[in-house]
Amino acid sequence: MTTDVTVKSLAAEIQTPVDRLVQQFADAGINKSETDSVTQHEKEALLAHLNREHGSAPGKLTLQRKTRSTLNIPSTGGKSKSVQIEVRKKRTYVNRDTPEAQQAEAAEQAQREAEEQAQRAAEELAKREAEAKRAAEEQAKREAAEIAKRNSAEKEKVTNQHTDEMTKPAQAEKARREAEAAELKRKAEEEVRRKVEEDAKRVAEEARRMAEEKGEEWAAAEKASAAVETADYHVTTSQHARAAEDENDAKVEGERRTRTRGGKATKQKKGNKLSESKADREEARAVTRGGKGKRKPSTLQQGFNKPAQVVNRDVVIGETITVAELANKMAVKGSQVIKAMMKLGAMATINQVIDQETAQLVAEEMGHKVILRRENELEEALMSDRDTGAAAEPRAPVVTIMGHVDHGKTSLLDYIRSTKVAAGEAGGITQHIGAYHVETDNGMITFLDTPGHAAFTSMRARGAQATDIVVLVVAADDGVMPQTIEAIQHAKAAQVPLVVAVNKIDKPEADPDRVKQELSQYGVMPEEWGGEAQFVHVSAKAGTGIDELLNAILLQSEVLELKAVRSGMASGVVIESFLDKGRGPVATVLVQEGTLNKGDIVLCGFEYGRVRAMRDELGREVTSAGPSIPVEILGLSSVPAAGDEATVVRDEKKAREVALYRQGKFREVKLARQQKSKLENMFANMTDGEVSELNIVLKSDVQGSCEAICESLLKLSTDEVKVKIVGSGVGGITETDATLAAASNAIILGFNVRADASARRVIEAESLDLRYYSVIYNLIDEVKQAMSGMLAPEYKQQIIGLAAVRDVFKSPKFGAIAGCMVTEGNIKRHNPIRVLRDNVVIYEGELESLRRFKDDVNEVRNGMECGIGVKNYNDVRVGDMIEVFEIIEIQRTIA
């Protein structure tokens, strides 16, 4: 039998204050003091109360983890925005015991609750019995008091009677009253006992019913937990969280496979990982080695449920977009977008740039609404915020002088300007666009002098685009030439009227009528023949007809009614640009509208900047320039491309954004063009590995010359040798250019530029090929020679002799020997030969033995007899012809 402990010893045993333990006993309904003993039953009652009060041990453990990452999201303007992503993962481990332990625990819990109910019922019964007993005693006391009161009244009424006579009835009455009180007490006690028993039965019945209900609830909970085990709570907030969880699962799975117990590696059954679900893997991981228990799988529960249907989004698509960006906007994986494109018949990679139409088809196919965005919204907003004047005033005509090379364009313009510009051009040919404005008696005229060389096609096209009138210079002694025809085509494409200047009219061999006849074949009809073109006979040397030419130009400009807004922000076109060593990027701009002032913010194509200085064509500083005035401006961020539109804007920050956007847009379009694979180019690309390449680094003094040279060099490419310009630009040859040439094994060509000291050191150290040119003819000719050296040589067979077989002899050393007569040319030893029978080649081999009168000889001439031994051939017959030839290597050139 267990010895009962006191409250004080129990407090010391469980290490808690005595006052707190007494208070806990009181809260449990057990009144105890420090010295009172505690039974086992009271301990259990206290424990049950504490469990109810504080709850049992936690049945689950929840772990939370946060991971942070950065995602780049494309935004307007070509920039990407970094977004911080926080993935919150919550994993709950539920502590579930085995079904047998749960059932035993359930039964024990039910029994414990029933005992507690019975104990509470017994306590209630004892309390009620005490109350009934107390009530019965009080009732008996009241009745006894009433009887005593009645007896005293009777004693007062009955007097003077003998004591003996009254004693017997009083005793009998007292016995009767006591019997009545006992009967009443017994009835009250029975009533109380009956009520207590009924309450005890009812409480026991409720306890039994509650135990049964608890058992059913636990059984249902067990079934629910089994269902939970098979459920997949693999719900994640995003594809990043899902990838992180799968990676973690794979790591845990690998650790479980390689984990050892007792020094012996545990082996797992190989299975098809592709067919396993997430719940299967967790359940397999939960089973312990000995099979004695389970560690229940952890379930990841998020704060929201997986969407049941696809969310349709508004997808904003620009002119170009990559597959990854499109998938990001639709919140799907890139593989799904690629699958959708494959269904539509388009093959793409995740980083490939696709156009707007393809992206729209894919997005609509996947059920999203497409919003097409114009990429130049920022540009349009910047251009609309310009202060332009309202009143248009007459302006000077912009005249472009065009024609064939050496037909006298620059000389004609020199006479008009009374300067000697042609002497400054290398080789006497124009290699830049010269922009000049001259004051005449009848008004101002702006002239653009374009190169006539074949290489400057694009430069001439730019001149025609920026002009109002084209003066076509044709030499009277030379007639219509290829560049003359090209100039006519440029003028027609730009829809610009032509004024024909028939130059060199003072030469004796001049024939103006032939010029008119030839030009009429190309649609340029003189006015006297019913056409629209004015023909003026001029001589740039003698100065004849110059005034008539100027009057014809001004007359044509009056017909055109040329007007421009003089006030407000300026706009124009870049005629030429170059990099000056002391001044930086310099651009020649022809103002077309408004007034360009010093300090204005100019946007030129990909470049922008504030105008720091302006100069006219004579090099004089100016502060403003109106319409039709060409000026050189300084202060741009870099060298703009010739032909770019120059516009004055208000905000330098917005100008910078537009320039950067244009650069990014140009790069995207370039990449999209490169990645577009065409079927017709497939076989050409397959043979690219066999083609030799001539790598060139080209530096020029101005942008136009650089562009023209690049175009001419690329046209020299053939099927066997290709010209590859690895680097080009304006300005001097720098160390960077030399390093690039060394890395790409290229030659360096400088056109009117020189290499600096650091570049020369690199060129000498790397033994690079550096060449300087000032005339484009020489540059192209030398590149042709270099390409010719890279061509594979051509081999040609030349017949040097012919011999007729007259007889055949047998030799033990050489086999069949043909006795021959040389009929043509010479027969040489060790040369390749052909054996002809009836003029048909039957064998081709090598002449092994050549003898004359038993002597070995190296050569036998025409008309002499000899013996010929053919190597590895014995079927020589009388009447055959032996043809001796040699292979000649012919050096090829590029035409």
From Swiss-Prot:
GO CC, one annotated term: cytosol
Main location: cytoplasm
Low complexity biased stretches: 100-109
G1 as annotated region, ranges: 403-410
Tagged with keyword Nucleotide-binding: yes
A Pfam entry, by short name: IF2_assoc
Skewed-composition ranges (Basic and acidic residues): 110-217, 242-257, 273-286
Entry superkingdom: Bacteria
Any one GO molecular function term: GTP binding
Domain tr-type G: 394-563
Residue ranges of the TM segments: none
Sequence segments annotated as region (G4): 503-506
Keyword annotations of the record: Cytoplasm, GTP-binding, Initiation factor, Nucleotide-binding, Protein biosynthesis
Location of region: G2: 428-432
Family assignment from sequence similarity: Belongs to the TRAFAC class translation factor GTPase superfamily. Classic translation factor GTPase family. IF-2 subfamily.
Function: One of the essential components for the initiation of protein synthesis. Protects formylmethionyl-tRNA from spontaneous hydrolysis and promotes its binding to the 30S ribosomal subunits. Also involved in the hydrolysis of GTP during the formation of the 70S ribosomal complex.
Full protein name: Translation initiation factor IF-2
Organismal lineage: Bacteria, Pseudomonadati, Pseudomonadota, Gammaproteobacteria, Enterobacterales
Gene name as annotated: infB
